[in-house]
Amino acid sequence: MRFTPILRQIPKLKLSEVLVKAGDGVPTGLAGIYKHPNPRPALVTLYNETLKTLKENFPADSVYRQSTEALTQNRLMIVESEEIVENIENQIGGGLIEEIVIQAADELSLASQLGGLKVWEELEEKPLDDQWVYFGKKI
C-alpha cells in the first residue's frame, strides 16, 4: 500500500501507524494490498483533509470542487455513521475498505495537485478555432 506524506505530519491523531500504511502481512486477497489496522480513522482524516484542501485551494464555483465535495461529504457521512467495516464497504460500493482508503488518499493527492495548477482559470493561449473539430464535427 502507499504512504501519504501529509498524514505523517498530522500531530493531533497520535497514531503509531501511518494512516495509509498496510498491516503487517495480513492479505486481503488482492495482490499487493494488505489489511489496514484501523481504516475508519484513516478515512475520516483523509476525507477531512480533502474537504479542507478543496475549501482552501478552489473557488466555490469550480465544478471539480462541487462534485468532489459532494462525493467526499457523502462518504464521510457513511464512515462516521457506521461502525461495521463491511457496512461501510457495501454503502460506498468502492470495493474493500483498503481500496477505499487508497481511493481517498489518491483523491487528496489529486486535489492538492489540481489546486496548485489552478485548473479553473482560463487558458493562457486560446485554442485554434479548428482544434476541437474531428471528422467534420466541432466538439
Swiss-Prot record:
Q: What induces it?
A: Expression is repressed by CAP2/HAP43. Expression is up-regulated by H(2)O(2) in a HOG1-dependent fashion.
Q: Which InterPro entries match?
A: NDUFA5
Q: Which UniProt keywords apply?
A: Electron transport, Membrane, Mitochondrion, Mitochondrion inner membrane, Respiratory chain, Transport, Virulence
UniProt membrane topology term: Peripheral membrane protein
Q: Spell out the Pfam families in the cross-references.
A: ETC_C1_NDUFA5
Q: Where in the cell is it found?
A: Mitochondrion inner membrane
Q: What is its main location?
A: mitochondrion
What family classification does the UniProt entry report for this protein? Answer: Belongs to the complex I NDUFA5 subunit family.
Its recorded name reads NADH dehydrogenase [ubiquinone] 1 alpha subcomplex subunit MCI4
Classification of source organism: Eukaryota, Fungi, Dikarya, Ascomycota, Saccharomycotina
